[in-house]
Design a protein with these regions (language model features):
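Acidic-basic catalytic patches of nuclease active cores, encompassing PD-(D/E)XK
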Residues: 1-53
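Non-catalytic C-terminal interaction segments of nucleic acid-processing enzymes
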Residues: 2, 24, 36-37, 52, ...
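Conserved catalytic cores of phosphodiester-cleaving nucleases, focusing on short active-site segments
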Residues: 62-79
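Glycine-rich, highly charged phosphate/nucleotide-binding loops
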Residues: 51-62
Length: 191
């Protein structure tokens, strides 16, 4: 099983929990994230490596579209402690540029509005690999800004520790200072 499939499997727990909640509460939805797409000729595998805006928009599109009585919203499920920078920026663009409602469902099984999301201030030093990792804006770890040798060593050390990293730029979510909402707030969509 490749690393992407391992991550998808981990997120499946939260996704299954969410789908069960939606079904129990008769909330209309459909799975809109690209990992749910049916494809031919390995399209979903190929798109992961494309860097154009359209491909990245598709790759980072939120997992669920919730359809209420008077409005719809998008929800991304994240069963991890962090979020990739490109992913976050795509959601932020949907909110700021298109006035689209985007929520995150995080590993604590709570909802968060993008504008309420807070990030932890991070140190450059990564204890797992015992290396300094470039950091921007005090929150974004940027492993791909290392030179090629350091980056490969970084990935190798993570793997040796039985850990996974995509190597993408990411930030850790500050679960103490982020404002969360109970899943039951979605029930108001049907009123």
């Amino acid at each position: 099983m490749n690393d992407f499939n391992k991550r998808t499997e981990k997120s499946k727990e939260l996704t299954d929990y969410f789908v069960k909640f939606l079904n129990l509460n008769k909330i209309s939805y459909y799975e809109s994230g690209y990992e749910f797409y049916k494809d031919n000729h390995n399209a979903t595998e190929k798109i992961k490596f494309l860097k154009d805006n359209t491909s990245e928009f598709i790759r980072y599109y939120p997992d669920f579209t919730i359809v209420g009585k008077d409005k719809s919203l998008l929800i991304e499920t994240k069963n991890s402690s962090g979020i990739e920078k490109k992913c976050y920026n795509n959601y932020l663009s949907l909110v700021q540029n298109l006035n689209i409602n985007v929520l995150l469902l995080l590993k604590n099984k709570k909802l968060c509005r993008l504008e309420d999301l807070k990030f932890s201030i991070v140190n450059k030093y990564d204890k797992i690999v015992e290396m300094n990792i470039p950091v921007t804006d005090k929150v974004w770890k940027e492993p791909r800004k290392m030179n090629d040798y350091e980056y490969k060593l970084y990935k190798k050390k993570y793997k040796e520790q039985g850990k996974y990293t995509s190597g993408c730029s990411f930030a850790f979510i500050d679960f103490e200072n982020t404002k969360f909402y109970d899943l039951k707030t979605l029930l108001s969509l049907n009123n």
